[in-house]
Amino acid sequence: MKLLGVDTGGTFTDFVWFDGQRLGIHKVLSTPQAPERAILQGIRELGLQGVRFYLVHGSTVATNAVLEGKGVRTVYITNYGFGDVLTIGRQARRELYNLQPQPEAPPVAAELCLETGGRLAADGSVVEPLSERELEALSARLRELAPQAVAINLLFSFIDDRFERQIERHLPDTLFISRSSDILPAQGEYERGIACWLNAWVGPRVQGYVQRLERLVQPAPVHVMQSSAFTIRADQAAKRAVNLLLSGPAGGLMGARRIGDEVGRPHLLTFDMGGTSTDVALIDGQVKLTSEGSIGPYPVAVPMVDMHTIGA
């Protein structure tokens, strides 16, 4: 079976195919409004229609949705008294010493932040239970707000996620639901909340794209490159958009490391310049990961390759 790698950039969509003996490359112009169209065009030009192949894809759909602010209407659910956590953020700010800083828009509008019970203490004990009345109140507000996605981030849910799961079970199946205990089961309600909200905010965009791509290339199995440089099945990627924010650049780093291994150069400085951005990273035998990355104004605590990006 042929292996086909596809990286969608802002300007070009690049293809690399390998049949076990030969390696080939191809390039077409990207189609930003519908990235899957450029992929299908490249497959046709390579003569791979009807040929059995395995597709590994590096995508910028999640990245662009975040940077361009094109997420969907998303409700954020948290515990009583913590609805402003994502707005307050951490002390680290762009203009920390500016006495009159320009205020930034909050990630989530106040009317889309819902507070409820189901609060745990740091040891996992229940501080405040989650009642049926509160669940019904959440459902009523969601019907009024009519979101496409919901992010659920309760205190200390990484210890025990029973209340997050209880809320999820009470929500309509038509909503894209993101639980912080699933997306980033780690300490720190701000970082966990941002990751959970980002996943819900751009998740439907990524899900729709991945499903369209799978239909276009079927029966070829599709895997998507994650920000951590590990691949994930397309159906799983559709649920974990926040793990795809550096999908394309991560694949480039893995390719650079492989070339370094082949020529006996384990220590590399990589420079990946595309039509939209330029990515720079260090490889010291292995691709380095960080949980202190960022995308646009948002900190992203999910594992991702450690690189620096500037405009091209």
Q: At which residue positions do the language-model features occur?
A:
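N-terminally biased helix-coil "hinge/interface" segments that flank
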Residues: 1-312
